[in-house]
Design a protein with these regions (language model features):
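Feature marks proteins synthesized as precursors that undergo proteolytic processing into two chains
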Residues: 1-161
């Protein structure tokens, strides 16, 4: 399957433009600060992250490096998870807006990684991406109303058709 251009950053910016009251930087910078300072993990998070680092992330050394415990070993409840790369990324997005992600150094890294691993997302694809507001898809399932994202991201094929 071909991956789609990540839309979260432009989507959040669109929502902020339409509904936001605080400055963009004030909304996004706390995420950078949390990633920089880290947070204490629960038993559930520590166990799940240790399992993923030990198994699911093994084919992806950069993910193991980002989420693995420094010095190796399993995460435990009470350990602090610090994500310096995420902090740097979120800080750039907070300061420079979505363009930091789509046309700046973050986009350069995404395009470079895609090219190195046979992906098909280019810097031009990232630069051209625009978030769009669309009406949700609605249907019923077992008597419940189900609301989902419209195409291209939808669960309609499995539930609403």
């Amino acid at each position: 399957l071909a991956p789609g251009v990540p839309g979260t950053v432009r989507g959040m910016a669109l929502a902020h433009k339409r509904f936001g009251k605080l400055p963009w930087k004030d909304v996004v910078m706390p995420a950078a600060e949390l990633a920089d300072k880290g947070f204490v993990m629960s038993e559930s998070l520590a166990g799940g992250l240790s399992r993923e680092v030990g198994r699911g992330m093994q084919p992806y050394p950069a993910s193991v490096a980002a989420y693995g415990k420094r010095g190796g070993g399993a995460w435990a409840a009470g350990d602090r998870l610090i994500l310096p790369d995420l902090a740097k990324t979120m800080s750039a997005i907070a300061t420079d807006g979505p363009d930091a992600f789509y046309t700046g150094w973050i986009g350069d890294l995404i395009a470079k990684d895609m090219a190195a691993h046979g992906g098909n997302i280019t810097k031009a694809d990232l630069a051209a991406y625009q978030a769009k507001e669309r009406a949700p898809v609605k249907g019923t399932f077992l008597g419940y109303e189900i609301t989902s994202m419209p195409p291209p991201l939808t669960i309609r094929a499995s539930i609403g058709s």
